Amino acid sequence: MKTCSQITFASLALLIAGSSLLYTTQTSIVKAEPTQIVSSSLQTSTQRDRTAVKQAIRDTLQLGFPGIIAKTSEGGKTWGYAAGVADLSTKKPMKTNFRFRIGSVTKTFIATVLLQLAGENRLNLDDSIEKWLPGIIQGNGYDAKQITIRQMLNHTSGIADYGRAKEADFTHAKRLYTAEELVKIGLSMPPDFAPGKGWSYSNTGYVLLGILIEKVTGNSYAEEIENRIIEPLELSNTFLPGNSSVIPGTKHARGYEGYDGASELKDITYFNPSIGSSAGEMISTADDLNKFFSYLLSGKLMKERQLKQMLTTVPTGRAEIGRYGLGIYETKLQSGVQIWGHSGDFPGFSTFAGGTLGGKHTLAVSLNSMRSANSPDPYKNILLAEFSK
């Protein structure tokens, strides 16, 4: 089987959207082989014909991913489909209830907390980072007094992404990073542009936002996400693992990558997620992500004013993203349907989750290998099929 994740270190670093490195107690390398389509047995509580969706899922699998999960919720009714394998060694089939690393979908959780804090008048989105974290950004062409919370949320701050630096080693499985280290790595590079004068994806900005949440609340960003989102919504399969390399439980796929054009996929399931920090450390399931985006897009997680701010977008210049809001991006499909969500590429896993405004129709897709820099968008045709009018 052609491996989708035949990538160089450079392209891996560019692909990372809040990703983490892994901790591997026992690294195994397995040869990728043709995988069998496996549909999970699940509750199909709607009469809608999803033949086209199934075909789009199967087509995505043929791009070279070991396995894929797709699950949707529409009007309170759920549907799901799994294909391929969760484990290349044992040929264990993929299942729709498996947990996976969600990478930069973490950013939507971080943004939700900050918008809730804004709605509580505990901060202003146009506050400077210097106001809350004085001295954390100094020199090298940066002016912390001009960089705002809003700009970090929508990636217009100009802060360089630490994922582009060689010091952020996405191939080193055991390394532990602190948030301060990641920020230092990012700020060692000059700004991409003056604050508010461009758009450039910055994981560094979201790590700073995690530090800021702790400054404002006295609690870690993980505690705030748990208290404000995970517990109230009863997202029982959603975790912030911190420095733990383990995906909790046994119901999860193994994650794979093929570095530097290798024809064999390396098992990188056990992974120290500290390199992701508040930009991308989280673990979840398709059901939990659908529930989160349903609540978010229906306005149940924040005040109307804050949701309007979240959905106020700026151009990105990137076709695959479209326009970016605050921790969420807008995709306009050829069918005319507007989707709000986020993707997350994380060594071993790739994810998309989102839905329509109002939250009545959501979709979560996960792959147990990260897409390569030059591969087609693995989600585009699934989105078109699922959200066709």
Please give the residue ranges for each predicted region.
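Sec-dependent N-terminal signal peptides of Gram-positive bacterial secreted proteins and lipoproteins
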Residues: 2-27
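Catalytic loop of the DD-peptidase/beta-lactamase superfamily, centered on the K-T-G motif
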Residues: 30-82, 266-389
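Hydrophobic (often cysteine-bearing) scaffold residues that line and stabilize catalytic clefts
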Residues: 49, 53, 102, 106, ...
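Residue-level preference for non-acidic, small/hydrophobic
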Residues: 57, 76, 107-110, 114, ...
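A mature extracytoplasmic/lumenal domain signature
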Residues: 74, 85, 104-106, 205, ...
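Conserved beta-strand positions that form and line the central face of beta-propeller blades
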Residues: 80-82, 93, 101, 128-131, ...
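Short, surface-exposed loop or secondary-structure junction motifs
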Residues: 87, 140-343
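Short active-site loop at a secondary-structure junction
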Residues: 90-151, 193-202, 277, 364
